[in-house]
């Protein structure tokens, strides 16, 4: 009986490791005003197409700002932007690789921030629920 329980525990543990939900951002760096960067967010452990995915940034003054969203497949991956980045930033997905992107153009000093990829916890059924999965972020510095 004890051996059987050990196997159940091991299989449960391995399943948990295999199914860990996570997002990992990359692509930040130093860029001059007017320049461009593309951020990436590699995701794993969940069905990427089923969820709204968002980009949020935190400025050096520690203010959090939602900036862009890509809705779920059920909502045709429609995109939304904050007024501060609309027309300059483009959010997109590679569903085959489960990667979210943020193309950032015409960068300004005020775009300096740590950028976070987040998953909307509401499973694509309502817009702007709460964000249950966050990455460690990637830092963008816009300076000459």
From Swiss-Prot:
GO terms for cellular component: extracellular region; immunoglobulin complex. It comes from the Eukaryota. Keywords: Adaptive immunity, Immunity, Immunoglobulin, Signal. Gene3D superfamilies: Immunoglobulins (2.60.40.10). Transmembrane segments: none annotated. One of its GO terms (biological process) is immunoglobulin mediated immune response. Residues 20-133 form the Ig-like domain. One of its GO terms (molecular function) is antigen binding. This chain was isolated from an IgA myeloma protein that binds phosphorylcholine. PANTHER family: IMMUNOGLOBULIN HEAVY CHAIN. This is Ig heavy chain V region M167.
């Amino acid at each position: 009986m004890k051996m059987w329980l050990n196997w159940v525990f091991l299989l449960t543990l391995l399943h948990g490791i295999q199914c860990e939900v996570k997002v990992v951002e990359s692509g930040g760096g130093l860029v001059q005003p007017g320049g461009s960067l593309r951020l990436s967010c590699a995701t794993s452990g969940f069905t990427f197409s089923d969820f709204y995915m968002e980009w949020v940034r935190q400025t050096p003054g520690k203010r959090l700002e939602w900036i862009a969203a890509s809705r779920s497949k059920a909502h045709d991956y429609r995109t939304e932007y904050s007024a501060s980045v609309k027309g300059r930033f483009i959010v997109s997905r590679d569903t085959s690789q489960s990667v979210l992107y943020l193309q950032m153009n015409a960068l300004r000093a005020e775009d300096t921030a740590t950028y976070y990829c987040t998953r909307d916890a509401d499973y694509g059924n309502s817009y702007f629920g709460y964000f249950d999965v966050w990455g460690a972020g990637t830092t963008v510095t816009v300076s000459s």
